């Protein structure tokens, strides 16, 4: 919202910062491999149970140790030093009849987690201008931003993986619970056949990521944070534009009359945004102890793209005028809003060459797509009138059309009206104004429309899911309408009646309101 000053030469300002984000270990003092091996050995000795595979007792030292001297510091593997920076350049100035302000901003943050993020980058540009003449004043404001974000998939993707793996834990829990005797990643454990458990001794998945399931302490399990953060990847790019423009016209002054009591204003609002999401979910084989989460033949790769866009345009013309004790405000407006969604998802199962993670490498491939459009067009007119702040009247009418409703009846008209009377403004007001300083009686009636349903619900949809018919003993697959639809979907209307009294006593120290209202709804969706 910053603007330049008139008669100001070009002024350039810069501010910025650079910083680092660090996740301290703090109170999380976990055991190293030697300490953990000794702990496991003593626990097994005390409970008279055999040592897990890989742990041995050194008869000379009397201490337990792990066979390959692995000593993984999971905090060091999972967390890294993040970097953030922000830079802003501002240019402003103005002449005798105009001002301008231009702001350029850059923000970048590299996250503290290894793997898919989160990382965030944003560019923003803002331009504000104003220009005034003797009769007209113009103002414009434009904002454009572009952002790019890498992070793990959304919760639904996590739940999907959890359904296959059984135990997908959050990052911190996995960092605390993973054994120091398991490597974060070991490419030598790659397995290209179905003998996953035999080849990696249950400690790694088929592609080298360490996994953990503990039978000694009961059913305790943890997910390798690097595994999870690389399984679920999402990139989101957003482009957004917002623009406003306005013109204030001094009508009487334009025609030579020296009056400030009549103003005409036009305002336009524009906005557009587009979001592109790219998803990647890879589910490799994982056999852990007696748990078989996924066999090699069921490894799954899912790739998806999602494009969302929305656009808005609003035009508003306002007249505001005063003649004596009469004050009139008239508004005429139009708005159009459109939303578009385009989803495309493909997945493949059974990968013979898993290091080539493309869908065409799968033995079986599947895909689905979905797109929809929602649009609403509105016209509005409103008039507010008051006489001496004593008699008040407001009347509004809207006409809205929605793409969600049946084509022939998708338009609806919604009127509203309200009246008010300031009894305390009358000469015959019987109460002491120092005691009752405001006494208002009001009544109103209004209608609102609701079209909050799904898209294309007024259209029958053909489905091929298990649609078969027997022709002379031969089962034939076909398509059929699978659901019933309402071909007469129209606006749901909510009607409101209201009567009220407002009182203010003792110079507004005490206020009182009494109301009666009635709400009814028609043509429920």
For each feature predicted by the language model, list its residue ranges:
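A surface-exposed, glycine/aromatic-enriched loop/edge motif typical of exported proteins
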Residues: 22-55, 145-214, 439-468, 509
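Short Gly/aromatic-enriched secondary-structure transition segments
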Residues: 27-31, 283-285, 346-349
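Residues embedded in well-ordered regular secondary structure
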Residues: 4-116, 184, 191, 195-214, ...
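Intrinsic-disorder/low-complexity loop/linker signature
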Residues: 26, 60-63, 70, 165-166, ...
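Extracellular/periplasmic, surface-exposed regions of secreted and cell-surface proteins
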Residues: 85, 128-137, 141-146, 196-281, ...
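A short glycine/small-residue-enriched secondary-structure motif
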Residues: 104-106, 284-295
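Transmembrane beta-barrel wall of Gram-negative outer-membrane proteins
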Residues: 75-152, 170, 178-182, 240-241, ...
